[in-house]
Structures are given as C-alpha cells and as structure tokens.
Amino acid sequence: GGPDGGNYYWTTSEDEPDLIYEWIDIENEATQLNFPHNDEFSSEQISLPFDFYYFDASYNYLDVNANGWVGWNSSNETVWENGNIPSSSMPRPAIFGYFDDLNPENDNSNSSSSGDIYYHVNEDRAVIWFDDVVRWEGEAGAGTYDFQIVLYSDGKFKCNYREMTGTTNQATIGWQNGLGTEGTQLSTVGESFVSNNFTWEAKTFSTASITWLTLTSDDGSLNGSLAGNESANIYAQVVTSDLEQGDYTAAINITSPDADPVAVSVTLTVT
C-alpha cells in the first residue's frame, strides 16, 4: 500500500512473497528497559549508532512507550486510549507496533502487570522487543503479546509478531508524523490485522538514488491525462553495468487525483 504523505509504502508477509517473517533473536544480548508508569516512556532513552530519517526529520535516539509504540520526544506521550491516525490527539511522531492500553512491568505496577520490554542496537538496526506484555484487562478482554519493532539505518521500519494471544482487534497499528497530519493506519479499534508469525514493513523509495531504472513513454512524457478505457505505454529500462552483485528493489508510482495510487514493485538480481 501507499504512498502516504511521507512517501512511505508498506506491505505484509501475507501479501508480498519476498517479505518473509523472520524474528530477530536478541534474547542473549538485549538490555531491559525500565518504566516509571505503564503509560509513559521508559526511563532510558536509546542512543542510535546511525541517523534515522523519518518524514522530514532525522534522529539519533529513540524513545520507547509502554503502550506498544516508539517515538521521539513525542507529544501526547501518556495517551493510553488509542484511536484513528493520523491525528493530532494521538502520540506524535510515532511508529505504532501495537498501540493499545498495555500493562508491562513498571514502577507503578499493579498485580495484573506482566511482561518486559528489551532492546538491542547495532550499526544496521535497532530492535525493540515487547516480550509477552499483557493488555490492561477491560471490557474488550485480556491479551498477551510477543512482538518487536525494528528500525533500520536506511530509514526502513518493520514489525514482527511472534505470538499474539487473546484480544487482538483493539490496537492501532501504523505510523504518523510529528504534527499528526500525515501517516498510515494499518489497523485500528475493532479491526483484526496481525497474527502469529506475521510481519509488515514500511519504507520510502527515492527516485534520485535509483540510477539503474529509467522510465520512458512513446511521446517522452510521464505525465498526462487518460479518458475512460484509454491506455498508454510506459517503458522501464534497466541498466546493470555499474551495479555490484546483489538484490535491488524499486517501485514505479502511479498517482492520480481521481483514483487510488498504485505502486508497481521492481525487483532486480545481479549475479
């Protein structure tokens, strides 16, 4: 799906054959986070060994919220009742792995709190692991969630869900910018989106960096108008002469004010 206002495209392990669910095991090298409250950021701010570009900003740190999301000195930090995004009343900026009223172990915990949150970073990625964190028991029922949010040095981010039990249709999942005006909602209250052994991923495609792919048309233009039932040919040329061996990806974005945008994935393997 996509793009949104940040030029983010997304896909899931159920929709994209090349996106395989792969849990990143950090159990033997992770650091546990401490939370003063079950609706706040952890006491520790995570330093990143890379600059993470998100919408129109760059960050070298990360804040982790007990309610299933990560952000950066975000507004509305203590909001526990999730809702639709983008919205200025929801936490922002933020990436919502599983934003719900969660209840991990914390300094203000009650008898029902359970589960811990860990992290591990290296030069390529940061992994935030919610390890069997429970849901605050309310009318919608209980749940226990084992998932991780992963941020990569190239600006990509993904969420891996290993085991999600109990109530799984009350969370907000997606991301939004610092104003709460742009973003993508993958799921919200009343919708079922995640399952066990499931992954979704979001990333941008910068045409300036894709030197191996060139688009042309019969008249040389890539813009114009088509009437109903009309068609036009767009030609894609791939040049591999300056590429090293490996896999490359791109997307051809087709947008219109009168129709939903379409992204055509392009995958190249150089051997």
Which functions belong to the PLM regions below?
Residues 1-211:
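Extracytoplasmic Ser/Thr/Pro-rich, glycosylation-prone low-complexity segments
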Residues 22-25, 205-237, 243-244:
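Surface-exposed binding patches on compact interaction domains or structured appendages
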Residues 46, 203-205, 220, 224, ...:
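Generic detection of short hydrophobic beta-strand segments and adjacent strand-loop junctions
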Residues 56, 128, 213, 229-232, ...:
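Extracellular/surface recognition and adhesion modules
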Residues 73, 216, 269-271:
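Small disulfide-bonded, cysteine-rich extracellular recognition modules and tandem repeats
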Residues 132, 163, 238-240, 270:
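Short beta-strand segments enriched in hydrophobic/aromatic residues
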Residues 242-270:
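Terminal connector regions
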